[in-house]
Regions:
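Hydrophobic transmembrane alpha-helices of multi-pass small-molecule transport proteins
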Residues: 134-151
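Structural motif at transmembrane-helix junctions in multi-pass transporters
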Residues: 41-48, 95-112, 183-188, 235-246
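Hydrophobic/small/kink-forming positions within alpha-helical transmembrane segments
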Residues: 22-26, 30, 62, 86-94, ...
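C-terminal transmembrane-helix exit sites in multi-pass transporters
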Residues: 96-101, 115-137
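Juxtamembrane helix-loop-helix junctions in multi-pass membrane proteins
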Residues: 24-56, 173-197
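Short, Lys/Arg-rich, polar N-terminal cytosolic tail immediately upstream
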Residues: 1-12
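Loop-to-transmembrane-helix transition segments
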Residues: 14-20, 71-95, 159-167, 212-234
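Structural signature of hydrophobic alpha-helical transmembrane segments
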Residues: 45-59, 98-115, 157-170, 214-228
Length: 246
């Protein structure tokens, strides 16, 4: 099985990693949405929920790095590139979770589907990646699909729609920036600093919007953290081995 995987092209591996990352991200989001439902989607609870999840993420990914003997905190937490990328992820997470708390799950992901379209365009324009007519056709078909699902003629626009759109914009910035230093760091190292920065951002958010959650919800947050950790790792691996316009 491993030998077969090694023979695959980088683009094919990138597709597999992308599918896996989106699966882990979506499943993680479902758990967080489930927890938020206990509190009637009150965003005041977001800070503590995401902060606790972040602590679990840091511990889990940090444990992997420790086992691999690749956990150099001084190196990781003083890297300008990783901290900037992590900051982008933190801002993206804020907008995403505000959307998660105020929009139906399906609507949120439909709007987030704009991110791959924007990323493909940025890969061609900013990184000068070669994007042929087939890939541009896929971009246009994807955008058309988003419009069909959203159905603009019946959609009641509200302020909440701006949240996933801003999240999509920061996803684009994050991946474009990551591509510029892709080979300098291990995917798990990037995922660790990403988890750290998101935790810091929501720790600050929690200071101004704190509401205690129930201990019973910690289990769901823990499962969410494991899923998110793998999502981070595969998302970084995707950008490292394939063109971001993929």
């Amino acid at each position: 099985m491993i030998q077969y995987f090694d023979k695959l092209s980088l683009e094919t591996k990138g597709i597999i990693f992308m599918i896996l990352s989106q699966f882990f991200f979506a499943t993680n989001d479902a758990f967080i949405k489930h927890v938020l439902a206990f509190y009637k989607n009150d965003t005041s609870y977001l800070g503590e929920i995401v902060f606790i999840r972040g602590v679990f993420v840091i511990f889990f990914i940090g444990l992997i790095l420790f086992i691999k003997k690749n956990l150099d905190l001084k190196f990781l937490l003083t890297s300008k590139h990783l901290l900037i990328r992590g900051g982008m992820e933190g801002i993206c997470a804020i907008f995403f979770f505000l959307g998660l708390a105020t929009l139906p799950f399906g609507d949120l992901y439909v709007l987030l589907n704009l991110a791959p379209i924007i990323i493909t365009a940025s890969g061609a324009i900013l990184l000068k990646e070669k994007v042929g007519w087939r890939r541009w056709s896929a971009v246009l078909m994807g955008f058309t699909g988003v419009l069909i699902v959203i159905n603009p003629t019946k959609l009641e626009f509200g302020f909440a729609f701006i949240f996933p759109l801003l999240a999509a914009a920061f996803i684009t910035l994050r991946d474009t920036y990551t591509k510029k230093f892709e080979q300098r760091y291990d995917s798990i190292q990037v995922a660790f600093v990403t988890g750290f920065m998101v935790t810091v951002v929501f720790g600050i958010y929690m200071l101004f919007h704190f509401k205690a959650i129930k201990l019973d919800d910690i289990f769901y947050i823990f499962i969410s953290a494991i899923l998110l950790s793998f999502g981070y790792i595969f998302a970084v691996a995707t950008v490292k081995i394939a063109t971001i316009s993929l």
